[in-house]
Amino acid sequence: MSNYPPTVAAQPTTTANPLLQRHQSEQRRRELPKIVETESTSMDITIGQSKQPQFLKSIDELAAFSVAVETFKRQFDDLQKHIESIENAIDSKLESNGVVLAARNNNFHQPMLSPPRNNVSVETTVTVSQPSQEIVPETSNKPEGGRMCELMCSKGLRKYIYANISDQAKLMEEIPSALKLAKEPAKFVLDCIGKFYLQGRRAFTKESPMSSARQVSLLILESFLLMPDRGKGKVKIESWIKDEAETAAVAWRKRLMTEGGLAAAEKMDARGLLLLVACFGVPSNFRSTDLLDLIRMSGSNEIAGALKRSQFLVPMVSGIVESSIKRGMHIEALEMVYTFGMEDKFSAALVLTSFLKMSKESFERAKRKAQSPLAFKEAATKQLAVLSSVMQCMETHKLDPAKELPGWQIKEQIVSLEKDTLQLDKEMEEKARSLSLMEEAALAKRMYNQQIKRPRLSPMEMPPVTSSSYSPIYRDRSFPSQRDDDQDEISALVSSYLGPSTSFPHRSRRSPEYMVPLPHGGLGRSVYAYEHLAPNSYSPGHGHRLHRQYSPSLVHGQRHPLQYSPPIHGQQQLPYGIQRVYRHSPSEERYLGLSNQRSPRSNSSLDPK
């Protein structure tokens, strides 16, 4: 026992020593009032130092906490709505694929065919399956578009419309009534269209792959105009929603102006902007001409039923019609009158009569000013277009010209102007043909005069060529410059006149047998002897040397006319044109003559012996 230390026995315990326990409790009692006193004094100091009571701070903290709770609650509600929309989308997808929810519930209970472990599991199964059986009849009776509008799910509504865009008649009956189920229809519609208007004009063409997506947005805007029932008030739109829609309309117009103006916009593009301002209001920077261009380019006859219900656009139509008439756009103004159903305010007969009077006066002025058939034709064509547009407008709206426009005889005027136009075309064609003949004659005369003034060789100077065509290539396929340094194209030209190459030696012109000595005081150089020979009269191989009597053209610096001896019997005289080709230039003869005068001994080797 001595090996173990007395640890447990040596330590005093509170149960074994009651005096020690009493001492500790008394000590705690003494210390407790001190702590309370310090805390109270610190609270007194803080309250004394602060300007407001402590309970006001507590109220502020509670207010901040309530704001945080409200924010959390709002986010939680949004999340819950999003989850519900996902569940509804899944259910609708299953229904479209032919899957019945009851069958799905049966499959859900299929694993429970095994005996349950206890009664609790059975009760849990019943409570889980019961709500699903109650929801099925509610979702099955409500249309898909209505559920999406009730849930304010813009993406779900767009997907539903996109999937059924081919059946627009059904959608136009379903979507306007479905929008009434939305809590805030104006905000919901603005969220549905998004910011597709910022895309370029190519996205609004019929060939664009995004054309169907653009049609979805236009259908939602048109449905929003058709949503309220007739005579039951107007749709309430918040001010901030109007401001957001106005910003979108201004950005849309700005893009169209940069792409060529509203008058050059695509049909779908113009229709979208027109429906947007008809739904949410016309911005202040929109002019009457802008609205007129949008109505003209959008095919407003197709959406006339929706435009007539616009609380923002209909009051402005009267001013737009009047301004259009003042600008001479009577036909466009009349189309707008019929689009918005304002026939009681603007008479078609008065509008068309004013238009015909104005066009007739303009046509008479143009005829008086016309100084040529072309100007008269332009005036007649313009008047014909005016009358044709009037007839087309009356046929479109089923108006009788005899009743609405008595005394004008529009059809007879159209026939007369067409005849005048055809007659003018014939006269202008005949005049153009005569002018072309005169121009051709003048051109031929000018070319003939130029040919006369151009120097040419006479037939005696330039006889016909023996060969079919001139070619400086010899029989051995070599060019003159390749055979000898002194031979050139002139030698080939001479050979074409003198005959075949078998009778004419193509050798160096400096060969001794071709050189003829000149008289004393001549040019100081030899002249080739074959210049005046017949084709078959010379052959160096036979040993004949025929000399040419040459009279120097320059003797002691004086120029004399060239003298040629008559041809020898059996020889052909070389034409004078070829002789001129081989004649030396005057500058060269002058140079050679001066050299002979200064050094008479330089040509002593050429003197005849």
From Swiss-Prot:
KW Glycoprotein (keyword) present: no
- A single GO BP annotation from the record? flower development
Here the segments flagged for biased composition (Polar residues) are 594-609
State how changing residue 146 to E affects the protein, per the record: In strain: cv. Edi-0
What residue spans carry the region label Disordered? 1-31, 454-488, 587-609
Residue ranges with Low complexity bias = 1-18
Q: Which GO terms describe its cellular component?
A: nuclear speck
Q: What is the effect of changing residue 55 to I?
A: In strain: cv. Sha
A Pfam family name for this chain?
A: Frigida
Instruction: Give expression by tissue.
Output: Expressed in ovules, but not in stamens.
Substitution effect: residue 79 to I: In strain: cv. SF-2
Q: Please name the InterPro entries in this protein's record.
A: Frigida (IPR012474)
> Which coarse location class applies to the principal site listed for this UniProt protein?
nucleus
Q: Which residues form a coiled coil?
A: 60-97, 409-440
- Sorted UniProt keywords: Coiled coil, Developmental protein, Differentiation, Flowering, Nucleus
Q: From start to end residue, where is composition biased (Basic and acidic residues)?
A: 474-484
- Specify the domain of life of the species encoding this protein: Eukaryota
Its subunit composition reads: Homodimer. Component of the transcription activator complex FRI-C composed of FRI, FRL1, SUF4, FLX and FES1. Interacts (via N-terminus) with FRL1 and (via C-terminus) with FLX (via N-terminus), SUF4 (via C-terminus) and FES1 (via C-terminus). Interacts with ASHH2 and RIN1, a component of the SWR1 chromatin-remodeling complex. Interacts with CBP20, FIP1 and FIP2.
| Recorded family membership | Belongs to the Frigida family.
Q: What does this protein do?
A: Required for the regulation of flowering time in the late-flowering phenotype. Involved in the enrichment of a WDR5A-containing COMPASS-like complex at the 'FLOWERING LOCUS C' that trimethylates histone H3 'Lys-4', leading to FLC up-regulation and RNA levels increase. Variants with an early-flowering phenotype (Including cv. Columbia, cv. Landsberg Erecta and cv. Wassilewskija) show loss-of-function mutations of FRI. Able to delay flowering independently of FRL1 activity.
The name this protein carries in UniProt is: Protein FRIGIDA
Tell me what organism the protein belongs to: Arabidopsis thaliana (Mouse-ear cress)
Organism lineage: Eukaryota, Viridiplantae, Streptophyta, Embryophyta, Tracheophyta
